[in-house]
């Protein structure tokens, strides 16, 4: 009886299989890479969504404290320095807790603190276009839900002496719709007469314009919202109609 066992390793009887220990090392190394990558991504998300929000919240607290102090002492700065607070923004559609100090400037350093006013555009309540940029997904994401704004929605600004109520709507006499999606290079949305080709045209209306990145987590486009000033009242007269029932705290 022939008890010869055929070789198992190929034509020449050589076994080419790698040692089990080698595969374990490969699998372990790959697993460690995935774990490390996952931790890096997690830390990035924590930084983007939590830490940036923490720093902005701290900055907002400092801004409102300074602004309230200046207002209490009758201080109005005609040409506010970059990064300083100029007005308090409230949007009823976003709820009674929504409040942000708008800062002067739109640089990275400015927008870390909160929504920023484009220098060179009108100031709150003035004739022209008070244009404001803001983040949608980081630094407390003040414009996260900007896409939810609808025609007829009120937007309220608080200055030292007045309540300014703007109403989201198409801008008469222009092609500017109340909500638009444009390219990042389309700066005409912030002109005194928005969406016109001539930046030197003098404005005749009191406009508010918001700009932010679109879609969320992308800078491929800009989402724009326009509004018109529809009411201006002294703060001594009490809260404006749009804020009826509000109990204002902090900002």
Where are these regions (language model features)?
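Extracytoplasmic/periplasmic soluble domains downstream of a signal peptide or transmembrane helix
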Residues: 130, 137-251
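N-terminal membrane-targeting segments
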Residues: 1-63
